Amino acid sequence: MKSDNHEILVEKDRFILQRKMEVSKIRMIFLNEFRSYFMKEGFLEVETPLRILSPAPESNIETFKSEDHFLIASPELQMKLLIMAGYEKIFQITHCFRKEKCSDLHQTEFTMCEWYRKDAKIEDLMKDCENIIKKEISEISTFFDGNKIYEINKDLCNSLYKKLNFPFEKIEIEEIYKDFAGWNPIEINDPIRFDIDMVTKIEPYLKNKAAVFLVGYPYYQASLARLRDNKKTAQRFELYINGIEIANGFDELIDGYEQENRFIKELAIRKEKGMNEYAIDKRFIENLKIGMPQTSGIALGIDRLLMVLLCLKSIKDVILFPQGSF
Protein backbone atom coordinates (compact mmCIF):
# COMPACT_ATOMS: atom_id res chain seq x y z
CA MET A 1 0.00 0.00 0.00
CA LYS A 2 2.82 2.41 0.84
CA SER A 3 4.42 1.65 -2.51
CA ASP A 4 1.21 2.51 -4.38
CA ASN A 5 0.89 5.83 -2.55
CA HIS A 6 4.50 6.63 -3.36
CA GLU A 7 3.94 5.89 -7.05
CA ILE A 8 0.88 8.16 -7.12
CA LEU A 9 2.89 10.95 -5.48
CA VAL A 10 5.69 10.55 -7.99
CA GLU A 11 3.25 10.73 -10.92
CA LYS A 12 1.63 13.86 -9.48
CA ASP A 13 5.03 15.52 -9.00
CA ARG A 14 6.08 14.67 -12.53
CA PHE A 15 2.85 16.06 -13.95
CA ILE A 16 3.22 19.36 -12.07
CA LEU A 17 6.85 19.77 -13.11
CA GLN A 18 6.11 18.89 -16.74
CA ARG A 19 3.41 21.56 -16.87
CA LYS A 20 5.95 24.16 -15.70
CA MET A 21 8.44 23.42 -18.46
CA GLU A 22 7.31 26.20 -20.82
CA VAL A 23 7.19 28.73 -18.00
CA SER A 24 10.71 27.67 -17.01
CA LYS A 25 11.90 28.39 -20.55
CA ILE A 26 10.36 31.85 -20.34
CA ARG A 27 11.96 32.36 -16.92
CA MET A 28 15.38 31.59 -18.41
CA ILE A 29 14.82 34.20 -21.14
CA PHE A 30 13.46 36.59 -18.50
CA LEU A 31 16.60 36.36 -16.35
CA ASN A 32 18.87 36.62 -19.38
CA GLU A 33 17.15 39.88 -20.35
CA PHE A 34 17.78 41.34 -16.90
CA ARG A 35 21.48 40.55 -17.23
CA SER A 36 21.59 41.79 -20.82
CA TYR A 37 20.06 45.13 -19.83
CA PHE A 38 22.50 45.73 -16.98
CA MET A 39 25.51 44.67 -19.03
CA LYS A 40 24.58 47.18 -21.74
CA GLU A 41 24.18 49.85 -19.05
CA GLY A 42 27.71 49.20 -17.82
CA PHE A 43 26.80 47.41 -14.59
CA LEU A 44 28.95 44.83 -12.85
CA GLU A 45 27.21 41.67 -11.62
CA VAL A 46 28.24 40.85 -8.05
CA GLU A 47 27.68 38.05 -5.56
CA THR A 48 27.38 38.54 -1.82
CA PRO A 49 26.86 36.01 1.02
CA LEU A 50 23.53 34.33 1.70
CA ARG A 51 24.41 34.01 5.41
CA ILE A 52 25.41 37.12 7.37
CA LEU A 53 25.91 38.00 11.03
CA SER A 54 23.94 41.26 11.13
CA PRO A 55 21.06 41.91 8.73
CA ALA A 56 19.57 45.38 8.37
CA PRO A 57 17.07 45.52 11.25
CA GLU A 58 13.55 46.00 9.91
CA SER A 59 10.61 45.61 12.25
CA ASN A 60 8.30 44.24 9.55
CA ILE A 61 10.65 41.58 8.15
CA GLU A 62 11.63 38.47 10.11
CA THR A 63 14.74 36.49 9.28
CA PHE A 64 15.78 32.82 9.45
CA LYS A 65 18.58 31.81 11.81
CA SER A 66 21.42 29.71 10.41
CA GLU A 67 23.61 28.68 13.35
CA ASP A 68 25.21 31.96 14.49
CA HIS A 69 24.26 33.71 11.24
CA PHE A 70 21.04 34.74 9.50
CA LEU A 71 19.85 34.10 5.96
CA ILE A 72 19.63 37.35 4.01
CA ALA A 73 16.28 39.07 3.51
CA SER A 74 18.15 41.35 1.10
CA PRO A 75 21.81 41.79 0.02
CA GLU A 76 21.49 45.53 0.67
CA LEU A 77 24.19 46.17 3.27
CA GLN A 78 26.85 44.17 1.45
CA MET A 79 26.08 45.85 -1.88
CA LYS A 80 26.30 49.29 -0.28
CA LEU A 81 29.71 48.38 1.14
CA LEU A 82 30.78 47.76 -2.45
CA ILE A 83 29.53 51.23 -3.43
CA MET A 84 31.53 52.70 -0.54
CA ALA A 85 34.58 50.79 -1.80
CA GLY A 86 34.37 52.50 -5.19
CA TYR A 87 32.02 50.34 -7.25
CA GLU A 88 29.73 52.58 -9.29
CA LYS A 89 26.96 50.49 -10.90
CA ILE A 90 26.26 47.00 -9.56
CA PHE A 91 23.46 44.45 -9.73
CA GLN A 92 22.75 41.06 -8.25
CA ILE A 93 20.15 38.35 -8.85
CA THR A 94 19.97 36.24 -5.73
CA HIS A 95 17.76 34.14 -3.49
CA CYS A 96 16.43 35.88 -0.37
CA PHE A 97 14.69 34.47 2.68
CA ARG A 98 11.93 35.91 4.84
CA LYS A 99 10.02 34.15 7.59
CA GLU A 100 6.45 34.79 6.49
CA LYS A 101 3.39 32.79 5.57
CA CYS A 102 3.48 31.43 2.02
CA SER A 103 0.75 32.76 -0.26
CA ASP A 104 0.14 33.68 -3.88
CA LEU A 105 2.47 36.67 -3.41
CA HIS A 106 4.88 35.40 -0.76
CA GLN A 107 7.42 32.60 -0.47
CA THR A 108 9.89 32.08 2.35
CA GLU A 109 12.59 31.69 -0.35
CA PHE A 110 12.32 33.89 -3.42
CA THR A 111 14.41 35.53 -6.13
CA MET A 112 15.34 39.19 -5.98
CA CYS A 113 17.13 41.50 -8.37
CA GLU A 114 18.82 44.36 -6.55
CA TRP A 115 20.82 47.13 -8.20
CA TYR A 116 22.59 50.35 -7.22
CA ARG A 117 23.65 53.43 -9.19
CA LYS A 118 26.25 55.85 -7.85
CA ASP A 119 25.47 59.55 -8.49
CA ALA A 120 21.87 58.69 -9.44
CA LYS A 121 18.37 59.62 -8.31
CA ILE A 122 15.25 57.50 -7.89
CA GLU A 123 14.04 58.78 -11.25
CA ASP A 124 16.94 56.87 -12.84
CA LEU A 125 15.72 53.69 -11.16
CA MET A 126 12.19 54.30 -12.42
CA LYS A 127 13.57 54.53 -15.96
CA ASP A 128 15.43 51.26 -15.37
CA CYS A 129 12.18 49.57 -14.34
CA GLU A 130 10.33 50.87 -17.39
CA ASN A 131 13.11 49.90 -19.79
CA ILE A 132 13.47 46.42 -18.32
CA ILE A 133 9.73 45.77 -18.48
CA LYS A 134 9.62 46.94 -22.11
CA LYS A 135 12.40 44.49 -22.97
CA GLU A 136 10.77 41.66 -21.06
CA ILE A 137 7.41 42.19 -22.78
CA SER A 138 9.13 42.15 -26.16
CA GLU A 139 10.97 38.90 -25.41
CA ILE A 140 7.91 37.21 -23.92
CA SER A 141 5.80 38.22 -26.93
CA THR A 142 8.44 36.79 -29.28
CA PHE A 143 8.38 33.53 -27.34
CA PHE A 144 4.58 33.45 -27.54
CA ASP A 145 4.72 33.86 -31.32
CA GLY A 146 7.05 30.91 -31.80
CA ASN A 147 5.72 28.41 -29.28
CA LYS A 148 2.52 26.64 -28.29
CA ILE A 149 1.82 27.33 -24.64
CA TYR A 150 -1.08 25.80 -22.76
CA GLU A 151 -0.48 27.12 -19.24
CA ILE A 152 -0.63 30.82 -20.13
CA ASN A 153 -3.49 32.93 -21.49
CA LYS A 154 -1.78 34.84 -24.30
CA ASP A 155 -4.81 37.05 -24.94
CA LEU A 156 -4.85 38.14 -21.30
CA CYS A 157 -1.13 38.92 -21.46
CA ASN A 158 -1.46 40.93 -24.67
CA SER A 159 -4.32 42.89 -23.12
CA LEU A 160 -2.11 43.78 -20.13
CA TYR A 161 0.79 44.81 -22.36
CA LYS A 162 -1.46 47.21 -24.27
CA LYS A 163 -2.63 48.80 -21.00
CA LEU A 164 0.91 49.51 -19.80
CA ASN A 165 1.50 53.14 -20.69
CA PHE A 166 5.11 54.33 -20.60
CA PRO A 167 6.28 56.27 -18.69
CA PHE A 168 4.31 54.95 -15.74
CA GLU A 169 2.06 57.24 -13.73
CA LYS A 170 3.44 58.69 -10.48
CA ILE A 171 1.13 59.17 -7.48
CA GLU A 172 2.04 60.88 -4.21
CA ILE A 173 1.27 58.84 -1.08
CA GLU A 174 -0.28 61.92 0.56
CA GLU A 175 -2.85 62.34 -2.21
CA ILE A 176 -3.83 58.69 -2.61
CA TYR A 177 -4.33 58.27 1.15
CA LYS A 178 -6.43 61.42 1.37
CA ASP A 179 -8.60 60.22 -1.52
CA PHE A 180 -9.04 56.55 -0.59
CA ALA A 181 -8.20 56.24 3.12
CA GLY A 182 -9.54 59.59 4.34
CA TRP A 183 -6.44 60.80 6.19
CA ASN A 184 -3.00 62.28 5.64
CA PRO A 185 -0.18 59.92 6.70
CA ILE A 186 2.38 62.66 6.12
CA GLU A 187 0.92 64.73 8.96
CA ILE A 188 -0.18 61.84 11.21
CA ASN A 189 2.41 59.38 12.52
CA ASP A 190 0.53 56.06 12.52
CA PRO A 191 2.55 53.27 10.88
CA ILE A 192 0.10 50.52 11.88
CA ARG A 193 -2.85 52.36 10.32
CA PHE A 194 -0.68 53.14 7.29
CA ASP A 195 0.09 49.46 6.69
CA ILE A 196 -3.50 48.33 7.23
CA ASP A 197 -4.91 50.93 4.86
CA MET A 198 -2.28 50.11 2.25
CA VAL A 199 -3.52 46.52 2.14
CA THR A 200 -7.25 47.16 2.56
CA LYS A 201 -7.79 50.45 0.69
CA ILE A 202 -4.83 51.52 -1.45
CA GLU A 203 -3.76 48.27 -3.08
CA PRO A 204 -7.35 47.31 -4.04
CA TYR A 205 -7.65 50.67 -5.82
CA LEU A 206 -4.32 50.12 -7.57
CA LYS A 207 -5.71 46.96 -9.16
CA ASN A 208 -7.50 49.35 -11.50
CA LYS A 209 -4.14 50.78 -12.56
CA ALA A 210 -1.94 48.84 -14.98
CA ALA A 211 1.28 50.31 -13.57
CA VAL A 212 2.05 53.12 -11.16
CA PHE A 213 4.90 54.45 -9.04
CA LEU A 214 3.86 55.42 -5.51
CA VAL A 215 6.18 58.18 -4.27
CA GLY A 216 6.64 60.38 -1.20
CA TYR A 217 6.37 57.85 1.62
CA PRO A 218 6.07 59.32 5.15
CA TYR A 219 9.28 59.75 7.14
CA TYR A 220 8.37 56.84 9.45
CA GLN A 221 8.35 54.57 6.38
CA ALA A 222 11.76 55.77 5.18
CA SER A 223 13.67 52.59 6.13
CA LEU A 224 17.14 53.10 4.59
CA ALA A 225 16.08 56.00 2.35
CA ARG A 226 17.03 59.65 2.78
CA LEU A 227 14.35 62.23 3.50
CA ARG A 228 13.21 64.98 1.18
CA ASP A 229 14.06 68.56 2.10
CA ASN A 230 10.72 68.89 3.94
CA LYS A 231 11.86 66.13 6.36
CA LYS A 232 8.31 64.74 6.31
CA THR A 233 8.59 62.42 3.33
CA ALA A 234 11.19 59.97 2.07
CA GLN A 235 12.93 59.76 -1.28
CA ARG A 236 11.38 56.36 -1.79
CA PHE A 237 9.06 54.78 -4.34
CA GLU A 238 7.31 51.49 -4.96
CA LEU A 239 6.29 50.10 -8.33
CA TYR A 240 2.85 48.50 -8.54
CA ILE A 241 1.44 46.57 -11.49
CA ASN A 242 -2.20 45.45 -11.30
CA GLY A 243 -2.19 46.32 -7.59
CA ILE A 244 0.80 44.09 -6.81
CA GLU A 245 3.99 45.53 -5.35
CA ILE A 246 6.89 44.71 -7.67
CA ALA A 247 9.81 46.91 -6.62
CA ASN A 248 10.97 49.22 -3.83
CA GLY A 249 13.53 51.96 -4.56
CA PHE A 250 15.42 54.53 -2.47
CA ASP A 251 17.65 57.52 -2.69
CA GLU A 252 19.98 55.91 -0.18
CA LEU A 253 20.56 57.44 3.23
CA ILE A 254 24.26 58.35 3.37
CA ASP A 255 24.34 59.83 6.90
CA GLY A 256 25.91 57.11 9.06
CA TYR A 257 24.77 58.66 12.34
CA GLU A 258 21.15 58.95 11.21
CA GLN A 259 21.23 55.37 9.89
CA GLU A 260 22.61 54.12 13.20
CA ASN A 261 19.78 55.86 15.08
CA ARG A 262 17.19 54.31 12.77
CA PHE A 263 18.70 50.86 13.29
CA ILE A 264 18.58 51.32 17.08
CA LYS A 265 14.88 52.23 16.90
CA GLU A 266 14.09 49.27 14.65
CA LEU A 267 15.95 46.88 16.93
CA ALA A 268 13.92 48.13 19.91
CA ILE A 269 10.67 47.48 18.03
CA ARG A 270 11.90 44.02 17.01
CA LYS A 271 12.67 43.22 20.64
CA GLU A 272 9.17 44.30 21.71
CA LYS A 273 7.71 42.01 19.06
CA GLY A 274 9.84 39.05 20.15
CA MET A 275 11.63 38.88 16.81
CA ASN A 276 15.15 37.60 16.19
CA GLU A 277 17.73 39.84 17.82
CA TYR A 278 21.06 40.74 16.27
CA ALA A 279 23.75 43.34 16.62
CA ILE A 280 24.03 46.38 14.38
CA ASP A 281 26.49 45.80 11.55
CA LYS A 282 29.26 48.06 12.87
CA ARG A 283 31.38 47.58 9.77
CA PHE A 284 28.56 48.96 7.64
CA ILE A 285 27.82 51.88 9.98
CA GLU A 286 31.47 52.89 10.46
CA ASN A 287 32.07 52.84 6.71
CA LEU A 288 28.90 54.86 6.16
CA LYS A 289 30.14 57.45 8.67
CA ILE A 290 33.38 57.77 6.69
CA GLY A 291 31.32 58.50 3.61
CA MET A 292 29.16 57.12 0.82
CA PRO A 293 28.47 58.92 -2.48
CA GLN A 294 24.97 59.88 -3.57
CA THR A 295 23.46 56.53 -4.55
CA SER A 296 20.08 55.14 -5.50
CA GLY A 297 19.18 51.49 -5.06
CA ILE A 298 16.24 49.23 -5.69
CA ALA A 299 15.00 45.71 -4.97
CA LEU A 300 12.70 44.04 -7.51
CA GLY A 301 10.85 40.75 -7.02
CA ILE A 302 11.72 38.51 -9.97
CA ASP A 303 9.01 35.95 -9.24
CA ARG A 304 6.29 38.58 -8.84
CA LEU A 305 7.17 40.47 -12.00
CA LEU A 306 7.26 37.29 -14.06
CA MET A 307 3.96 36.15 -12.56
CA VAL A 308 2.32 39.49 -13.38
CA LEU A 309 3.65 39.69 -16.95
CA LEU A 310 2.43 36.12 -17.62
CA CYS A 311 -0.96 36.92 -16.03
CA LEU A 312 -0.67 33.98 -13.64
CA LYS A 313 -2.39 33.88 -10.27
CA SER A 314 0.45 32.83 -7.98
CA ILE A 315 4.22 33.07 -7.79
CA LYS A 316 4.09 29.32 -7.22
CA ASP A 317 3.32 29.07 -10.93
CA VAL A 318 6.72 30.53 -11.89
CA ILE A 319 8.84 28.64 -9.31
CA LEU A 320 9.69 24.99 -9.95
CA PHE A 321 9.78 23.95 -6.30
CA PRO A 322 7.72 26.46 -4.29
CA GLN A 323 7.56 26.13 -0.53
CA GLY A 324 4.47 24.27 0.63
CA SER A 325 4.14 22.30 -2.61
CA PHE A 326 7.21 20.03 -2.49
Task: Set out the residue ranges of the language-model regions.
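Class II aminoacyl-tRNA synthetase catalytic cores and aaRS-like
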Residues: M1-F326
